Swiss-Prot record:
Lignin degradation and detoxification of lignin-derived products. The gene is LCC2. Cu cation 1 binds at residues 82, 500. Binds 4 Cu cations per monomer. Its EC number is 1.10.3.2. This is Laccase-2. Pfam families: Cu-oxidase (PF00394), Cu-oxidase_2 (PF07731), Cu-oxidase_3 (PF07732). One of its GO terms (cellular component) is extracellular region. It comes from Thanatephorus cucumeris (Black scurf of potato).
Length: 599
């Protein structure tokens, strides 16, 4: 990895007035890794899983050159990278989702993403946005530091050691999982923290877990640490906490929040939190716990070790937090699903390689009649089981778990339109189509277009309208500078769906049946949606084609997505127009010449 800036310490002293271009080089290649003790070939950035930490300062411009060296025929060999949470003002072409904002980068080609960061600060991450490729390892953390952070006097340490990348891990390449048509294969084999974990079924002949298999954060008594926690998973949710220590939440998804002290918090795929931990306990070793809470009984752990403890590093004396998933959830995931259908379009194809709907896209087709009869009953059982489990955890351990609805933005709290009605209201009803096994929004299952949405808009010589997009592109045009409210609800089947909107942080003005909150609602870019639904608001002040999708990657593969074409005429011309360079324009002509095996 190449970087043109000085040390993080020096960066923290540089005011935004001295913003610079921060260069990185990404060699995306296949390589063998064993983060949980089981070796497999993966998709790596600079030979690492997770990929290297990207850091910059407020006001800097990130310039990241991606060199595609992928060669393993069992995995996708083209690639794209999405910079999750970066708003991409006037740089929608750099956002990364294949066939929304770009064509993929072919093997043996390179592409440089250039992204002015503007006023953004906080905790973000990057991942492949081509098919299910990030499942195979292409994911890593991003931190944008603020030299004038309002909370700077509340912590002493905030560096690469305190960044925690939580990730589920699969032993089988994602393409092979899709080809099996078996939903059980979408359950991860293990979980990791900063690329370290354990795979421990009793029947497996794998490495025994040792201290070296666990990530270790060393702390000094009396010091305060800003922990930045990222859920870079394909499906897994975690409950994160540090044994014997409280942590004060100050950031959610890149948005500073008013402080909330908790013992633990739930974090869904795509979400991020910062919390301040004070090392105020007896010098010893303590568990950092992050059990997976939604798909399998797996304890994911790291260690917090006091440097003041003069004894050799050892396991904590106290037991670690265990998690018991309800039998109803286990039954949901282990129900016999049978074979999978598809929408009649190949998984690899010319100039449409988000991979969206093949293979897993109908993983529940054969169980349709059975599950449709049981859906309401099952969903109720799942929700009841989870609620009872949360109650038991809180009562037994007196654990204070973050209530997401209580998050308040530190700067400019309040919905964009205040309490007045939104200018545009968009009802979005999602669910599973039992006839074909596809997830839908408003009865449409997303399929990527033959030409990237952004390219379509930029080359349209007439006014962009709905007729420019096919039905299964599921593209909705939004007018500029309006307050938009999305009413998102549907048939969640007892699962919490992490919904992510590109190009915006939004205000969650209502959770389920709770009273609406326009005064100080939570603000973030990933929100969990259940049957009860949510309502979110944002202002259309960032022209571009922005993806809305479930961040359970397998659900995105099954069509749980749509695109908002925001202010399309302003994308083409004016002060907020998007102006891709020559290398971007050449991606599609290079990609469309590839044989299917190299896509």
């Amino acid at each position: 990895m190449a970087r043109s800036t000085t040390s993080l310490f020096a960066l923290s002293l540089v005011a935004s007035a001295f913003a610079r271009v921060v260069d990185y080089g990404f060699d995306v290649a296949n390589g063998a890794v064993a983060p949980d003790g089981v070796t497999r070939n993966a998709v790596l950035v600079n030979g690492r899983f997770p990929g290297p930490l990207i850091t910059a300062n407020k006001g800097d411009t990130l310039k990241i050159t991606v060199r595609n060296k992928l060669s393993d025929p069992t995995m996708r060999r083209s690639t794209t990278i999405h910079w999750h949470g970066l708003l991409q003002h006037r740089t929608a072409e750099e956002d990364g989702p294949a066939f929304v904002t770009q064509c993929p980068i072919p093997p043996q080609e390179s592409y440089t993403y250039t992204m002015p960061l503007g006023e953004q600060t906080g905790t973000y991450w990057y991942h492949s946005h081509l098919s299910s490729q990030y499942v195979d390892g292409l994911r890593g953390p991003i931190v944008i530091y603020d030299p004038h952070d309002p909370y700077r006097n509340y912590y002493d340490v905030d560096d690469e050691r305190t960044v925690f990348t939580l990730a589920d891990w699969y032993h089988t390449p994602s393409e092979a999982i899709i080809a099996t048509h078996d939903v059980l294969k979408t359950i991860p084999d293990s979980g990791t923290i900063n690329g370290k974990g354990k795979y421990d079924p009793a029947s497996a002949n794998t490495n025994n877990t040792t201290l070296e298999n666990l990530y270790t954060l060393k702390v000094k008594r009396g010091k305060r640490y800003r922990l930045r926690i990222i859920n870079a998973s394909a499906i897994a949710s975690f409950r994160f906490g540090v044994q014997g220590h409280k942590c004060t939440i100050i950031e959610a998804d890149g948005v500073l929040t008013k402080p909330i002290e908790v013992d633990a918090f739930d974090i869904l795929a795509g979400q991020r939190y910062s919390c301040i931990l004070k090392a105020d306990q007896d010098p010893d070793s303590y568990w950092i716990n992050a059990p997976i809470t939604n798909v399998l009984n797996t304890n994911v752990q790291a260690l917090l070790v006091y440097e003041d403890d003069k004894r050799p590093t050892h396991y904590p004396w106290k037991p670690f937090l265990t998690w018991k998933i309800s039998n109803e959830i286990i039954q949901y995931w282990q129900h016999k699903h049978g074979s999978h259908g598809h929408k009649g379009k190949g998984h690899h194809h010319k100039v449409r390689a988000i991979g969206g709907v093949s293979g897993l896209s109908s993983r529940v087709k054969s169980r349709a009649s059975d599950l449709s009869k049981k859906a309401v009953e099952l969903a109720a059982a799942l929700v009841a089981g989870e609620a009872e489990l949360d109650k038991r955890q809180n009562e037994d351990n007196s654990t204070i778990v973050l209530d997401e609805t209580k998050l308040i933005a530190l700067v400019q709290p309040g919905a964009p339109g205040g309490s007045r009605p939104a200018d545009v209201v968009v009802p979005l009803d999602f669910g599973l189509n039992f006839a074909n096994g596809l997830w839908t929004i408003n009865n449409v299952s997303y399929s990527p277009p033959d030409v990237p949405t952004l390219l379509k808009i930029l080359t349209d010589k007439d006014k962009v309208d709905a007729s420019d997009f096919t039905a299964d592109e599921h593209t909705y045009i939004l007018p500029k500078n309006q307050v938009v409210e999305l009413h998102i609800k549907g048939q969640a089947l007892g699962i919490v769906h992490p919904l992510h909107l590109h190009g915006h942080a939004f205000d969650v003005v209502q959770f389920g049946d709770n009273a609406p909150n326009y005064v100080n609602p939570p603000r973030r870019d990933v929100v969990g949606v259940t049957d009860a639904g949510v309502r979110i608001q944002f202002r259309t002040d960032n022209p571009g084609p922005w993806f809305l999708h479930c961040h359970i990657d397998w659900h995105l593969e099954e069509g749980f997505a749509m695109v908002f074409a925001e202010a399309p005429e302003d994308i083409k011309k004016g002060s907020q127009s998007v102006k891709p360079d020559g290398q971007w324009k050449k991606l599609c002509e290079k990609y469309e010449k590839l044989p299917e095996a190299l896509q």
